[in-house]
Amino acid sequence: MGRTSRIGSVLFSCIALAVGVTAPPAAATPNAGPGQVSAPQVTWGSCQRFLGDAARDIPTAQCTTVPVPISETDPTGPQAQLAVIKIPATGQRIGALFVNPGGPGASAVDSAAGMSYALAGSPMAEHFDIVGFDPRGVGYSTPAVRCRTDAEFDAWRRNPMVDYSPAGVAAIEQINRGYAKECADKMGAAFLAGVGTDSAAKDMDTVRRVLGDDQINYLGFSYGTELGTAYLEKFPDRVRAMVLDGAIDPAQDTVASILQQMTGFQVVFNDYAADCAKSAGCPLGTDPAHWVDRYHQLVDPLVTKPGPTSDPRGLGYQDALTGTFNALYTPQYWKFLTSGLLGLARQTDAGDLLMLADEYDGRNPYGHYSNGQDAFNAVRCVDSPTPIDPAVWADIDKRTRELAPFQAYGQFTGFAPRDLCAFWPVPPTSAPHPALPAPPGSVVVVSTTHDPATPYEAGVNLARELAAPLITFDGTQHTAVFNGNECIDSAIVNYFVDLTVPGNLTC
């Protein structure tokens, strides 16, 4: 899923686990011809080390780790180990289909395993190895970016962080500085400098060489479109077919991206409220003019007093907004948002909003967090320059209050905290720039008209920059491929299997 760096309440979770990098592997690598780079030598085996007992449900799956140097300038130095899963094609193999679910920070190993279920019996499973690799710092790859303990993350979530007075802003920025320092102390600056999309694109080509394929097929969702675009830019001749769904426009800077994303979330909040209003007892009522006000009447009191839940933690303000954002990614979650808001209205049980927040933040029922939010922060902070002028962030706050009033607490004060990336210990390794035109037929872009996290216009822009066809899905959700729409799915399957490039299409 594409995550939002929400203004006003930093949605960046933290977990602490001191992790070291591994020593370089002693095994020799296969010989390479003149001018070629050797592929690392790996051994494929059981996926239980990544998937646990779930590996038994995919008996043909094979897993391995692929070593890559932490520093490009020190290829024989410390290595990261990339977790890789491969579910072999069931019939005549065309090649490998790399999948990336987005984030950044979501596990592609988990995504590929799940996609193997969804595509079972389809031409995609018949002709392609389904492959997922976790970029460095992410998921099952090691070292995994982890910055705070579970208890520290729980405590962070209890802080509403809505005081935008000068003193309140200074306190929030101190929290952001502390988080950045913890990440640097636990992971090291050298490792953090190499976790961005630029490195991930090069690592994906290393995995391609391990698989022995001349070209890749690629399906990227949300942030996965950014990774795919970066790979296409670096290795255009190594792409057979690529689909980018839920596009991120690489030409957008941080400010433009925030403003566009907040606009998208307000549009979908309105879609949710309109759908909710069709049912008797909708907690937001039936008058569109009052939906935002009613939402604030329900959630703003949580700043000073948590809402009731069966979980002893209760529902804090930050969790209520996080849960709301999570629900807006898909209409399938709207019923949980309604249930949580009804719990606040009736002062009974708002636990469904807490459940949505836990899922978004990667907290399991036992109170342990995945490293998804830490990886999300580590990647985004090096992928693009972050404004450091406080006046820029005050202006962003003013504009997002106008564009997305549902998520804005209180009144504009003229002050706002700088994002934690403004305090990141290493500089960015990439900068916004338009995507380069792609080789004809090598890429297709898919964009959804009411996508909150990756708004439709970003897909239009990316398709234009790549000189690629655009498939438009007329709907309200985040991403669309292999999500039950026959119009889209048949076009995508024909493209991957037969290289039948669709024209511009609306489904």
Residue ranges and their predicted role:
Residues 328-346, 386-391:
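Short helix-capping/linker segments at secondary-structure and domain boundaries
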Residues 351-384, 388-389, 393-396:
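Long, low-complexity segments enriched in small/aliphatic residues
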Residues 32-319, 378, 384-507:
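Gly/Pro-rich cap/lid or specificity-loop segments adjacent to the active site
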Residues 1-29, 204:
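Secretory targeting and sorting signals
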Residues 305-321, 329-333, 366-374:
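Structural motif
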Residues 279, 344-353, 485:
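Short, solvent-exposed helix-helix connector turns and helix-capping sites enriched
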Residues 248-266, 338-341, 349-365:
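Flexible "cap/lid" loop of the alpha/beta hydrolase fold
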